[in-house]
């Protein structure tokens, strides 16, 4: 119905088996400038096959995985830098200490150096939003 009404159009993406859809008002930017921690419940990463197709990264929420079998941590947020998932940060809000803890931080291969500073800014912003005073974890600051 939306295709027939001209609201969206069916498009083909190289390497994808299924069709994708593009909103008629969507504009494809020349480049993407974003740095964001993404909730594991965000629609961008919740649909795992689409996440793998878009980013070439296998993302799994490991909260129900027994601790010894976890790869990236308990509550992991992917970090998008530009148009790529470049890292995964396991986060824990330690409210008693006022610290956003990063027990584990995993970088994907080939990450540009400026991604580290961008991630630290995002972690600082998230800590502030949560009412926490600091961020602590291996490989930070």
Annotate each language-model stretch with its function.
Residues 1-141:
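Long, charged, low-complexity, helical-prone intrinsically disordered regions
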């Amino acid at each position: 119905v939306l295709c027939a009404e001209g609201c969206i159009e069916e498009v083909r993406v190289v390497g994808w088996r299924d069709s994708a859809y593009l909103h008629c008002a969507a504009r494809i930017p020349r480049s993407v400038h974003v740095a964001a921690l993404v909730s594991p419940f965000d629609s961008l990463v919740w649909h795992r096959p689409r996440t793998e197709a878009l980013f070439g990264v296998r993302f799994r929420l490991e909260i129900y995985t027994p601790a010894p079998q976890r790869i990236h941590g308990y509550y992991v947020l992917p970090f998008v830098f530009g148009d790529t998932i470049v890292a995964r940060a396991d986060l824990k809000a330690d409210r008693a200490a006022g610290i956003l803890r990063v027990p584990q931080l995993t970088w994907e291969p080939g990450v540009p150096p400026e991604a580290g500073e961008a991630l630290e800014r995002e972690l600082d912003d998230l800590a502030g939003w949560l009412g926490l005073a600091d961020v602590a974890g291996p490989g930070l600051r």
